[in-house]
């Protein structure tokens, strides 16, 4: 396509519309959507062709089929031809296919002229909507009857000319042959009458055929109008159905979104309820855990305390036996004696027993329970108090009591000398982590016996032995276990309080963490909602950007190609000019050389002239001198 055609359309149509860019690329091969945008913009700005298209046709999305595109363009072409009166060679099928860009540009130019001249298109729009069609020459051709009428008119004109010629010939013959007989004239008149009758019959038949053709054409036009109206109604129904489907889809989408929002709200409410229930259940669980731990520790302490009293009872029985041995009136108890010995509280021994009882009470609530002995007897604290006043006989089946270590205070008490002979050697000291051997278990009567009035030299030895026993007693296995359980039991309430404090601190910190996490989740939700809201417009923008980018890239490529072509053409022109200028440059150099040569010659001639003038002056002076002389 020539660039002049595109420039002409840009000049003419650019005065009418501004919106769709009238680029050479688009005008060289205009797509249908581009033409649709141009027509809609012309209708919007100038009002030309207003009322020609329905609202559905004004949207390019509804005009996608080939037939609808052809009908759209045909309407515009018919209106433009009726308004302008100029014939247009543009065919809508070729325009839709992308061919004949020059003819489409001519159509656009004619539209621009009509808009600039402010020609009204109301009558043309009405005629086109009524169904009037135009031929390529610009004349309305509603039916074939018009062509027939034209043909018949031509035939009438020919018949008239023939009649005139016959009359002229007859007149000339009359003038030439005045002497012819009247019979010939009558014959001619008969012939003329016959011819006239035949012609009139033919004319009547022609008129009848014309009327029939007109009726047929009218019926055809009516049928065409009916079919067009039916098609329009169908198109309207289709458009209405499409709009209804779109409305239904929109309603469904809205319902889905509302349903989703409701489900989200319900899920949030459920999560909040669950969190509240969890928050309510957590302090209960912590309290139950603390109670379980306390119960477990109490049970463990009770079990330990149940296992403790056996050595204490044995030590008490052994102490009672030693006290009996100290008194001068008592006889050493044989190993086969049954029952238990109990000594009343007297002096330092009573204080020792009080100390042991206080230790038992400090160890826990298990001290108040009945204490089981090794032989299966059970002793209560009330029974222990009664044994101070009344002693039960020791059973023969009882196991021998463990050796009781005498404290240093007891050595100061006076003991009778009568027990020295009957007293046995002191029991061997229990080592760390070792139990009594079988030999020691077999010995029934190993008790600690003290002298009534030991000599002063023997006192330090007894004291050293008691100190060793005390040191060894600290490292005894049973005593060690008792002390450990006692320490554990004493430390258990403090540990419970610490654990409670820790649990309270941990719960407070957890609540703070939950609040922080909830705030962060709310922030994330709000940010996600904003992102989702901005996603749809962003997607639409991206779609439009993609279309614009494609067109811009194509335009850029075309401009680059044009730039390259222009650069190449410029280089070629420069080469051509250089080739043309080179001989001129040579000629110029030659001319300059000739000018220099001529200047040199002129200078030489001037010098000769000056020399000749000098010679002439000399000659004149010599002549004048000679004449004077």
Swiss-Prot record:
- BP GO annotations: camera-type eye development; cerebellum development; cerebrospinal fluid circulation; cilium assembly; intraciliary transport; photoreceptor cell outer segment organization; pronephros development; regulation of microtubule cytoskeleton organization
Please give the chief subcellular localization of this protein. Answer: cytoplasm
Q: Which GO terms describe its cellular component?
A: axoneme; ciliary basal body; extracellular region; intraciliary transport particle B
Q: One Pfam match, by short name?
A: MIP-T3
The cellular location(s) given in this protein's UniProt record come to: Cytoplasm, Cytoskeleton; Cell projection, Cilium; Cytoplasm, Cytoskeleton, Cilium axoneme; Cytoplasm, Cytoskeleton, Cilium basal body
**Region feature (Disordered):** 130-511
Q: InterPro entries annotated for this entry?
A: TRAF3IP1 (IPR018799), TRAF3IP1_C (IPR041476), TRAF3IP1_N (IPR040468), TRAF3IP1_N_sf (IPR042576)
Q: Where is the composition biased (Low complexity)?
A: 394-403
- Which Gene3D superfamilies does UniProt cross-reference here? Microtubule-binding protein MIP-T3
Stretches with biased composition (Acidic residues): 352-362
What keywords is this UniProt entry annotated with?
Cell projection, Cilium biogenesis/degradation, Coiled coil, Cytoplasm, Cytoskeleton
Per its record, what are the GO molecular function terms? microtubule binding
Transmembrane helix among keywords: no
Coiled-coil positions: 220-282, 511-602
- Give me the stretches of Basic and acidic residues compositional bias: 145-306, 471-511
> Can the keyword Coiled coil be found in this entry's annotation?
yes
Q: Which family does it belong to?
A: Belongs to the TRAF3IP1 family.
Purpose of the protein: Plays an inhibitory role on IL13 signaling by binding to IL13RA1 and recruits TRAF3 and DISC1 to the microtubules. Involved in the regulation of microtubule cytoskeleton organization. Is a negative regulator of microtubule stability, acting through the control of MAP4 levels. Involved in ciliogenesis.
Assembly and interaction partners = Component of the IFT complex B, at least composed of ift20, ift22, ift25, ift27, ift46, ift52, traf3ip1/ift54, ift57, ift74, ift80, ift81, and ift88. Interacts with ift88. Interacts with il13ra1. Binds to microtubules, traf3 and disc1. Interacts with map4.
Put simply, this protein is called TRAF3-interacting protein 1
What organism is this sequence from? Danio rerio (Zebrafish)
What's the encoding gene here?
Answer: traf3ip1
């Amino acid at each position: 396509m020539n660039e002049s055609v595109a420039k002409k359309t840009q000049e003419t149509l650019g005065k009418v519309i501004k919106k769709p860019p009238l680029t050479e690329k688009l005008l060289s091969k205009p797509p249908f959507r581009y033409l649709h945008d141009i027509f809609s913009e012309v209708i919007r700005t100038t009002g030309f062709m207003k009322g020609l298209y329905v609202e559905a046709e004004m949207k390019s999305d509804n005009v996608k089929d080939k037939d609808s595109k052809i009908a759209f363009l045909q309407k515009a072409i018919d209106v433009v031809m009726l308004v302008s009166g100029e014939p247009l060679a543009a065919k809508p099928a070729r325009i839709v296919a992308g061919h004949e860009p020059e003819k489409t540009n001519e159509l656009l130019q004619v539209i621009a002229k009509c808009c600039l001249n402010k020609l009204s298109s109301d009558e043309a729009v009405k005629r086109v909507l009524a169904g009037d069609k135009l031929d390529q020459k610009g004349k309305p051709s509603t039916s074939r009857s018009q062509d027939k009428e034209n043909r018949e008119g031509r035939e009438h004109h020919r018949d008239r000319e023939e009649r005139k010629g016959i009359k002229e010939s007859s007149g000339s013959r009359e003038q030439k042959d005045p002497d012819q007989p009247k019979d010939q004239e009558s014959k001619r008149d008969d012939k003329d009458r016959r011819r006239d009758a035949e012609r009139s019959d033919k004319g009547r038949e022609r008129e009848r055929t014309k009327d029939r053709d007109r009726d047929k054409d009218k019926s055809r036009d009516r049928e065409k109008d009916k079919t067009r109206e039916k098609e329009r109604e169908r198109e309207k129904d289709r458009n209405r159905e499409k709009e209804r489907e779109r409305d239904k889809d929109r309603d469904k989408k809205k319902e889905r979104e509302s349903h989703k929002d409701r489900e989200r709200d319900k899920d949030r409410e459920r999560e909040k309820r669950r969190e509240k229930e969890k928050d309510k259940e957590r302090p209960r669980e912590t309290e139950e855990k603390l109670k379980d731990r306390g119960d477990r520790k109490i049970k463990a302490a009770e079990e330990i305390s149940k296992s403790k009293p056996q050595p204490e009872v044995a030590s008490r029985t052994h102490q009672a036996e030693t006290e009996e041995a100290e008194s001068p009136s008592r006889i050493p108890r044989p190993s086969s004696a049954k029952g238990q010995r109990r000594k009343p509280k007297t002096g330092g021994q009573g204080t020792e027993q009080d100390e042991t009882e206080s230790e038992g009470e400090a160890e826990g609530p298990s001290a108040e329970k009945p204490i089981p002995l090794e032989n299966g007897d059970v002793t209560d604290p009330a029974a222990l108090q009664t044994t101070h006043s009344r002693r039960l006989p020791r059973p023969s089946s009882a196991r021998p009591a463990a050796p009781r270590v005498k404290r240093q205070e007891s050595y100061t008490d006076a003991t009778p000398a009568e027990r020295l002979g009957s007293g046995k050697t002191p029991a061997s000291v229990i080592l760390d982590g070792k139990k009594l051997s079988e030999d020691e278990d077999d010995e029934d009567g190993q008790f600690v016996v003290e002298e009534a009035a030991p000599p002063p030299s023997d006192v330090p030895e007894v004291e050293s032995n008691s100190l060793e026993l005390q040191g060894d007693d600290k490292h005894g296995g049973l005593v060690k276990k008792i002390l450990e359980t006692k320490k554990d039991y004493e430390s258990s309430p403090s540990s419970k309080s610490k654990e409670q404090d820790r649990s309270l601190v941990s719960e407070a910190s957890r609540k703070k963490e939950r609040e922080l996490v909830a705030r962060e989740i709310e922030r994330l939700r709000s940010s996600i909602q904003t992102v989702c809201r901005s996603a749809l417009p962003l997607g639409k923008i991206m779609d439009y950007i993609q279309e614009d980018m494609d067109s811009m890239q194509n335009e850029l490529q075309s401009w680059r190609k044009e730039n390259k072509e222009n650069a190449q053409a410029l280089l070629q022109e420069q080469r051509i000019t250089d080739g043309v200028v080179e001989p001129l440059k040579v000629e110029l150099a030659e001319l300059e050389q000739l000018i220099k040569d001529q200047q040199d010659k002129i200078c030489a001639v001037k010098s000769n002239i000056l020399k000749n003038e000098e010679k002439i002056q000399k000659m004149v002076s010599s002549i004048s001198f000679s004449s004077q002389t």
